[in-house]
Amino acid sequence: MAAPALSWRLPLLILLLPLATPWASATVNGTSQFTCFYNSRANISCVWSQDGALQDTSCQVHAWPDRRRWNQTCELLPVSQASWACNLILGAPDSQKLTTVDIVTLRVLCREGVRWRVMAIQDFKPFENLRLMAPISLQVVHVETHRCNISWEISQASHYFERHLEFEARTLSPGHTWEEAPLLTLKQKQEWICLETLTPDTQYEFQVRVKPLQGEFTTWSPWSQPLAFRTKPASLGKDTIPWLGHLLVGLSGAFGFIILVYLLINCRNTGPWLKKVLKCHTPDPSKFFSQLSSEHGGDVQKWLSSPFPSSSFSPGGLAPEISPLEVLERDKVTQLLLQQDKVPEPASLSSNHSLTSCFTNQGYFFFHLPDALEIEACQVYFTYDPYAEEDADEGVAGAPTGSSPQPLQPLSGEDDTYCTFPSRDGLLLFSPSLLGGPSPPSTAPGGSGAGEERMPPSLQERVPRDWDPQPLGPPTPGVPDLVDFQPPPELVLREAGEEVPDAGPREGVSFPWSRPPGQGEFRALNARLPLNTDAYLSLQELQGQDPTHLV
């Protein structure tokens, strides 16, 4: 019968055994309290409280970090009947032994016979349980009858939050306790304070504590050691309000200055004397600027004004004479210059009886404003007869009849007929770059003379108004080379075997301006001169080169 009774009791004991073990552990933990704080450098302070007194038992705190290879142990010392405390020294006081990611396992071990029993255990996060050391080096910087300035320092504070601190201070006055003293809070890192509204010749005590703003379970540091100081006694007969005396002195000085100025100005005897004293230090500008007194009578405004009247700055004069120009669109000019070979070459143009020259008038307009309309350089073309009619005394009567050109009759000054565009070959002769990207052409009137003659219809028919672009082709056979000029008539006559007399000193140069304008003749440009393609000539330069033609 005993065996069956034991068989059903054994499972019941096994079921109750795991329930009894946690109950016993909870009882032990429920009767003790284990609290630790980190001073942010190399110290962990712990306090352990136990309800039941431990008789003749030694206990210690063991620290084991999860990321470090070291471990530390400190002996718990009794603080009261049921409390023990110790400090875990991790290294040098100012060394940074732990960081925000470290977790330290703290255990309270008590000896029971030959074995150590775990009384409490905690996973300690250092930067969530901060308590700094109490401030040190308190000193009185300045003390007066009603005020006192005190400073202090912080020791063993981590660089992780050295600027994120707050302070509390309290002052103990006579007849009160520390608990009754009002708290003065400083919400920033300020290691000084100015105490005001103090009583003269009175003894005070001062304390301060610090707390970092980081950490969930962070608490205030212990209070610093009290600093005793005494205010200065009040002087006998001295006004208790010092600023009132300064105010009275300032007002008295201001009124005295106003009265003195009034008397100096209104007094008849001191008036001229004062003016004489003030005037002797003022220099006379007429001594340095004679024109101010001689011409303007001392009037500074007239002296500084412009010597020219305002009407001289207005454009009231006659506008300068500018050669008539014709500005065409770029696309239209390109078509005019590139498609001239559609019209067959007239015989008169291929006979080298006339030459065509061109110049640009952009150099005449020497100014260019930033906001002005941008217009490309206009090409101005004029045509003249290359060979003038030789005089009878020059001895060229034996020249071939077919090679003598007809003289070009000068145009009247009142006629504004524009010159026609030169042929495509003529453009290549003077400015080969015109075919690639010509500028808008313009025309210029011819010189004045007795007769008046317009260009032949064959030249005018070569400049149609609306042409389509056409690619350039090789030159037409029979047309003379476009690069060389037609030789002068003296060279032609010498090649023909006829005698040609030498030209005089004034006739040896074959420039169009080599003869006076009254002769009614024109000279062709010397073929030996270098070509001036796309040259920028002003109006004065053109008139100086060819006085008989006003462009």
Curated annotation (Swiss-Prot):
Belongs to the type I cytokine receptor family. Type 4 subfamily. It is found in: Cell membrane; Cell surface. SMART domains: FN3 (SM00060). Receptor for interleukin-2. This beta subunit is involved in receptor mediated endocytosis and transduces the mitogenic signals of IL2. Probably in association with IL15RA, involved in the stimulation of neutrophil phagocytosis by IL15. Pfam families: IL2RB_N1. Residues 134-234 form the Fibronectin type-III domain. A motif (WSXWS motif) lies at residues 220-224. Residues 1-26 form the signal peptide. Residues 266-551 are cytoplasmic. The chain crosses the membrane at residues 241-265. PROSITE patterns: FN3 (PS50853), HEMATOPO_REC_S_F1 (PS01355). It is a single-pass type I membrane protein. Residues 27-240 are extracellular. Residues 393-412, 433-476 are annotated as: Disordered. One of its GO terms (biological process) is cytokine-mediated signaling pathway. The keyword Transmembrane applies. GO terms for molecular function: cytokine receptor activity; interleukin-15 receptor activity; interleukin-2 binding; interleukin-2 receptor activity. Disulfide bonds join 36-46, 74-86. This is Interleukin-2 receptor subunit beta. One of its GO terms (cellular component) is external side of plasma membrane. A motif (Box 1 motif) lies at residues 278-286. The WSXWS motif appears to be necessary for proper protein folding and thereby efficient intracellular transport and cell-surface receptor binding. The box 1 motif is required for JAK interaction and/or activation. The keyword Ligase does not apply. Glycans are attached at residues 29, 43, 71, 149.
